[in-house]
């Protein structure tokens, strides 16, 4: 079979052939149809500052360095005094960075994801040097801290390693901090004593590492070890170790013994400030207020202005520093907010800093009944709406990272990470944060979920599949009743597995699982499974393993033949929904790569699949697979008229997908026979020929072409069948043997 690849170029539509037949069509037969790919470009730019460091430029003047998301990721340099943007440094082959610091020799270092490289920035020359990966096989670097003699330290995911870099030595790997754990989320360093501390998740460990001997000791309080509310941000200040846990509760510990010096408070910021010029005060944000801790008395509380009112930060701090006795802070990730506070007078100001907006990877896509296409940005959470007719995209506002979408009666339902919150948005009303969309409920605190990923409209209720929170096992199936507004949750419906795909077939809800637990866990299960829910009784039935060895059933749909079609890793499967019996498995190009893969049943009856960057078209009669695109196809969805929408992407050597900020559309070829006759064999006036039914390139099946109703006499029908089958033989669609069998069936139909 010949295959044709579709390649998109910016802002133009390409007409390329996608049909495939064994031999060229005869002159009397229609030519293979064409499809179009249109690139609608970047839908919105946005700001996401992961962390900021208040340092200096080459002349010793103050400068904020902010690690930002982007395609590629960048570090922005902003003047905190003049409030001007001074420079943007690109981090090639990255999508952003979770670590940023400045060494004692003035060099700025950033740690990236998903390539886990260290980048060196010279403030004097603006040169950016990619120093490479400090530890092989990692995807994220965290928690950069300076040491002595130009050395910096950091942590990694998924190996929970700690490493250092110095200009003279290069990289040094101190190894994994705790067996079986994946995250070394932050580090704190005492250069004088050559001791480092590492926050390890998601199992809950705080490792004290002697940098000279390599000795490791877990100083996390024994009653908290193993708790998924694990150490997240850590700072060594004034001889104390400040620890923010993943759910924001905080502790102050003795850095050598782990003894608790203070607790029962929260930290919302990315850790704390360093020690203030007074030699005793440490600052952080708690909720949306500025707080302080006195290391001389081990007391803490909100910071107050001259009038006694709490100093409001307006959000969590993501970087702290001191200038001329004042505290300076970057506030929040998304809006460029900042704060200064003068502890002498109590004066303070909240203001904006001009961090530059960047194109950011699209996290998810959904299409509305009115034809608009909505995109949601990774982590940042901005929601944009595209009018395909004009090509105009409108940025609506932030909803949070939507890992799943559903629709009912014109209302968009959104599953938002990290609180596993479900929201409802009416596109016909103005977008107003907090009211439209409005939050319906959360699944994190009471049910241990963090990503609602699968939505299925069952008429009277929306069913939602979700995956467990960090360090936990067991997804959930939630039913939201449209009339009452109530929801019910069934946790761990497939033991130790998440619920990641749903489809309604008849009066039954089908679900597919993933063996993966929450972030930082190792799977307990070995194979993904199917289950059903009777929509009348609510009874749940385990339907077994559709594809042996598959880790995830990533997509399910009611097929064009009335059967259940699904995708498990790189295998397409078809199941009889009545008996539950497996009908077919087809191995597809590509492999499961971590980005949600999808399949959709098109109005042309074919099934379209995105897998590992491929766009595939599956014939529902023969199960033949045609490759339409062999790269750059992610987060597929389909609109009401059958056009397919997806985002761009480039797959790296570590299988991470980057550069996904562009939205594209594939319009399938025109279908000459909508609603095709999909009976398995060719049937003439009720007589089964035994010949497999099949498609002509223009979308007509053989059964479509034999039109018994158009012929009043049997003689006319015979002439018609003879002519149709002759043309199909000439086109290479039927063999001569097939033709004889079909004509024979037509002959037997008289009587």
Task: Name every feature range the model reports, one short phrase each.
Residues 630-669:
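Blade-level signature of beta-propeller repeat domains, shared across WD40, Kelch, NHL, RCC1
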Residues 670-751:
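Soluble extracellular-acting proteins and domains
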